[in-house]
Amino acid sequence: EQVERRCKAYTADAHRTHLVQPGMVYISQTTEVGTLYTKAEVKALHDVCKKYGLLLFLDGARLGYAVESPGNDLKLEDLPHLCDVFTIGGTKQGALFGEAAVIVDEELKREFPYHIKQRGALLAKGWLLGIQYETLFTDNLYFRLARHAADLAVKMHKGFKEAGFYFLHNHETNQQLPIFTQTQFDKLKEKGFYFDHFADMKDGRIVTRFCTSWATDPANVDRLLEAIKDL
């Protein structure tokens, strides 16, 4: 609805030639606050984009974590039917570096190699990207690593709720955003835990961020959940 309102406002503006011409809608899965787009929501965005001649780009830096999260209904195999371009994250999901760009739109496919070259993104040893993904997609490793993070996120979410904490968003993806008082925040820092001061609330409380990943040690999650019990 937001995208359609923007598009309608743009096309109705008699002075639109003085504005930036819209060309693409960008979303990420998961989002920067750990929320998920549903399949129906992405389908709705796709339909609006087609209606107004826009491309739909999905940033999948955390795509594996999204796919393996409880309640997610947007699968990897759905994306070529709903997006013009999407990425399959590597850097945040076990690869040494790099992202895999999946281009569905045929016109973009023809132009993309030239954009890579012109913007300094062409690696002399590009096979180093390919071999990482070949390994990650062997024996379902990519999704097994993501499932590890998802399982620990569920455990963390449950532990925070049982300790009486509220969340900025109530979800179970690998980014958890529990809300702390300043005193709770300071006490947990003193216990030696590192976590993000994500945002400040109007009432003085602090939104924090804890992330799980393919490399998270379950023992560290246990230590954290034990530590928050007496905050």
Predicted regions located by residue number:
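Active-site phosphate-binding strand-loop segment of PLP-dependent enzymes
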Residues: 2-60
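Conserved C-terminal alpha-helix-loop-beta "cap" of PLP-dependent enzymes
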Residues: 154, 159-229
